[in-house]
Amino acid sequence: MNTAIITGAAQGVGLCIAEALAQRNYRIVLSDIDTEKGPAAASKLNLTHGEGTAAFFHCDLSNLREIDALLSFTIETMGGFSVLINNAGYLRAPFLALSAQDIQDMITVNLTAPIYATQQAIKYWDGLHQGQAGCVVSVTSSSSFKTYASIAPYGAAKAGAAMFTFAAGAFHPRVRVNAVAPTAIATGFDKNRMRVETDRTGPGYTPEEEMRAMGLKRLQPQEVAEAVVRCVEDKGLYGKVLYLDAVEGIKIHDGYT
């Protein structure tokens, strides 16, 4: 039985991905910083799909050492894994009101952590007897291609994740690395949690500007999950970013077109 690791899986898109893969007989390790919703999500999957389907592991991606612990937990608990889903994200805005820690955490969670997790997963698969075919899918954002002043660090990190994915097609002959880049999602980030208090207004200070631009019609979490599953199952996808738009559908980018 295949096993998938999913970061940011306690709710929203991550949980939808977990459900979609569980329906395809995957075992799931859900990781998240939410120690209430995470275990509850794992319990629900076990109730629906059978005991042993899912396990929860607390993982704060702002600390890369916790990624090592997540992979070790999965290997010890599930006997290994064949799929890594880098779904977790972190967004704070507006840009000109951010602290140094806000900026650092956005870059780490949205860019450095997926890069490091992918590297460690590939090294794990490469070290297995005769090697093992593996699959990595990262959930980036339409901000990879077009971003806004108030969320500039987030957009920069997501653009980096897309560029990393384009290059990743050459990493290993048996490992496929792809990404999905959705526009605004119906659940999305909690606007109140993402805001940093400020009395200033204007470019770089107004987090609603990108919501207006991106949120005319929002994707459903299930639509994003379906695209992730496509990346997992389609053996012909290498180093691609699937841009998801609620109106225009899916566009596949390879870094050259």
From Swiss-Prot:
Query: What GO molecular function annotation could you give as one example from this UniProt entry?
Result: oxidoreductase activity, acting on the CH-OH group of donors, NAD or NADP as acceptor
Instruction: Look at the named UniProt entry and state the broad enzyme category this protein falls under.
Output: oxidoreductase
UniProt EC number: 1.1.1.-
Q: In which pathway does it act?
A: Mycotoxin biosynthesis
Q: Where are the transmembrane segments?
A: none
Q: Which PROSITE patterns match?
A: ADH_SHORT
Keywords of the record: Glycoprotein, NADP, Oxidoreductase, Signal
Any Gene Ontology CC annotation: cytoplasm
Name the InterPro entries on file: NAD(P)-bd_dom_sf, Sc_DH/Rdtase_CS, SDR_fam
Give the protein's recorded name: Short chain dehydrogenase helC
- Which species is the source of this protein? Aspergillus fumigatus (strain ATCC MYA-4609 / CBS 101355 / FGSC A1100 / Af293) (Neosartorya fumigata)
Q: Which gene encodes it?
A: helC
